[in-house]
Amino acid sequence: DPDFFGILDNISSSLRKVFKTTNKVTFAVSGTGSSGMEMGMNNLVESSDEVLILKNGEFGDRMENLALRLGAKVSTMSVPWGHSFNQDKVIEKIKSMPNLKLICVVQAETSTGVLQEIDSIGRYVKDKDIIFLVDAVTSLSGVNLEVDAWGIDCCFSGTQKCLSVPPG
């Protein structure tokens, strides 16, 4: 149905504006934020890949569990729930991992409400051969998120938080 494809194209165009990206592979999926996490990681992580997960709440823990199930060599950085990471310390950790393929971070941890600054991390890995995956389920449209400028390779969100849009 051409009308249906027109609606999908309009949604994708609108999402590119919200995500601040020109990436043509920007699309909506009928599913939860966790389905976005699973799709992103299942497409990016291969067995034995070196993955760094930043953990400061429930969804960082969930990313770690998923990466382990996919067979990745998982390293983590953790701060107590309710705290954010110092970006300079994260960059130092990244520098110490010469075989790092993927770094995963939650921009705004739903379980604690903590906002994680990610711009410096993204700018650092942008020109490296490191994939930057960001969970923006709670943050998209509520705080600044610049997918292209910050070098984010894979970013997922959900409609139920700051976008305030019903699913479907």
What are these regions (language model features)?
Residues 10-11, 28, 34-168:
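Conserved PLP-enzyme active-site core in the AAT-like
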Residues 1-29, 34:
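A glycine-/small-polar-enriched, mobile loop at the entrance of the PLP active site in fold-type I
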